[in-house]
Design a protein with these regions (language model features):
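A helix-coil-helix interface module used to build multimeric assemblies
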Residues: 1-147
C-alpha cells in the first residue's frame, strides 16, 4: 500500500503484525476444536491461547527464519513455538498452510469490506442529500457533449 493514499485502518488490516495475529488465532481456534474432539489435551489448547495471546510477534525475526526455511507459515510457527513452549507441538496438526493463509485472507477481506461498506453508506447518503438539494437547479441541456 502506498502510505499517502492509504487510510490507517486499512494499513492496520493488511500489516504483517495483523496477519501474524490472525494466523495465531486461526491456529489457536483449530487447537480448540482438536481439544474438543479429544485429539489434543484441553490444557495444551488453553496454554496455546494464553501464551500466544501474550506474544509480540517480531516481523523481522519471522522474516529471518523464513529466509532459512523458505516457508512463511513454518517461519511463523517456529517463532510462535518460542512463546508457547512444549505445547507448540500441538499447533498446526492436521492443517496445511493454505488452511491458514486462505482463512486469514478471508478475515482480512471481511474487515476491509466492513470499512468500505461503511464508507459507501456515507457516500450514498451524501449523494442523496445533494440530489435533493439540487433537484430544482436549472442546468444547460446537452446532447452529444454540445450545449
Amino acid at each position: 500500500m502506498i502510505p499517502r493514499y492509504s487510510r490507517p485502518e486499512m494499513v492496520a488490516i493488511w500489516s504483517p503484525e495483523t496477519r501474524f495475529r490472525i494466523w495465531f488465532e486461526i491456529e489457536a481456534y483449530a487447537c480448540d476444536a482438536l481439544a474438543e474432539l479429544g485429539v489434543i489435551p484441553r490444557e495444551a489448547a488453553k496454554t496455546i491461547w494464553e501464551k500466544g495471546s501474550a506474544a509480540k510477534f517480531d516481523v523481522e525475526a519471522i522474516d529471518e527464519i523464513e529466509r532459512v526455511t523458505k516457508h512463511d507459515v513454518i517461519a511463523f510457527l517456529t517463532h510462535l513455538a518460542e512463546f508457547v513452549g512444549p505445547d507448540a507441538r500441538f499447533i498446526h496438526q492436521g492443517m496445511t498452510s493454505s488452511d491458514v493463509l486462505d482463512t486469514c485472507f478471508a478475515v482480512q477481506l471481511t474487515r476491509a469490506s466492513d470499512i468500505l461498506l461503511t464508507d459507501i453508506d456515507g457516500l450514498l447518503a451524501a449523494l442523496k442529500r445533494r440530489a435533493f438539494e439540487h433537484k430544482n437547479t436549472v442546468t444547460i441541456g446537452r446532447s452529444h457533449g454540445i450545449h
